[in-house]
């Protein structure tokens, strides 16, 4: 348990693999992106991408595509194209290149676990915001992220965030679905796991692609200009609320509460 988790009752709310909510009624879902929304571990991620790519293709990763709003699966195929590597089935065990890459990426990232806090950082206000939104009445929290699930868990655990999210109902980078579909699948997963109707959902993220995915899925979006997209970009993309960062916890909570308010449940 990290020092962040030790004194936070909310961090013990989600026991992965169970549907225990402590007797709370669930009626709204708060979903978060991870990279450049909650944490910045780009340096470690790039190193892991390069190692996994080399192990699968036998070639160095010379060119890496833009990462914002993209899944690890998308990044792999775009990297193949950028580096002139043909996409084909591996001769080893009949596993395709993507399956091998996902495995190698997990291994490469786990090997760099100790570097996450050394070469990465928790973004300002992220811990407080995640803790506060987890405490909203009727709220259930998870992540919809481009990272594969093991790596998402590594990132959240390293910075004391993991306990605020039910990772079982999240959307991850190995899933063969666009981000908008992942958001909808998380809503369905939450309803099935907790046997409760989710009346409203909000997605907190940092890129234009994330905002567009939320609009496609029909969920509300709080965009945080902590990544590559500017406040102007995020507003133009159609975010319901745009924040410069997460440092004003009350502002984050007010926006999440307002966008997921269900009159009959308040």
Regions found by a protein language model. Give the residues of each.
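Active-site neighborhood of HAD-like aspartate-dependent phosphohydrolases
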Residues: 14-68, 74-81
């Amino acid at each position: 348990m990290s020092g962040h988790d030790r004194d936070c009752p909310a961090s013990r709310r989600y026991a992965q693999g169970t549907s225990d909510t402590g007797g709370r009624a669930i009626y709204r879902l708060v979903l978060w992106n991870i990279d450049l929304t909650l944490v910045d571990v780009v340096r470690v991620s790039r190193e892991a991408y390069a190692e996994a790519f080399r192990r699968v293709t036998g070639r160095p990763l010379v060119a890496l595509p833009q990462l914002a709003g993209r899944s690890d699966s998308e990044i792999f195929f775009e990297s193949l194209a950028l580096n002139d590597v043909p996409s084909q089935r591996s001769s080893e065990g009949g596993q395709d290149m993507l399956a091998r890459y996902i495995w190698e990426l997990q291994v490469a990232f786990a090997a760099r676990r100790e570097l996450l806090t050394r070469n990465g950082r928790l973004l300002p206000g992220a811990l407080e915001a995640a803790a506060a939104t987890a405490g909203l009445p009727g709220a259930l929290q998870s992540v919809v992220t481009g990272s594969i699930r093991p790596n998402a868990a590594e990132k959240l655990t390293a910075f004391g965030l993991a306990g605020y999210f039910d990772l079982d109902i999240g959307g991850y980078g190995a899933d063969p679905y666009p981000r908008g579909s992942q958001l909808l699948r998380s809503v369905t997963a939450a309803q099935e796991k907790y046997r409760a109707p989710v009346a409203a959902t909000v997605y907190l993220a940092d890129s234009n692609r994330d905002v567009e995915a939320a609009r496609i899925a029909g969920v509300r979006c709080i965009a945080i200009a902590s990544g590559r997209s500017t406040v102007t970009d995020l507003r133009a993309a159609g975010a319901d609320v745009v924040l410069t960062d997460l440092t004003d916890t009350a502002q984050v909570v007010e926006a999440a509460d307002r966008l997921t308010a269900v009159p009959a449940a308040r």
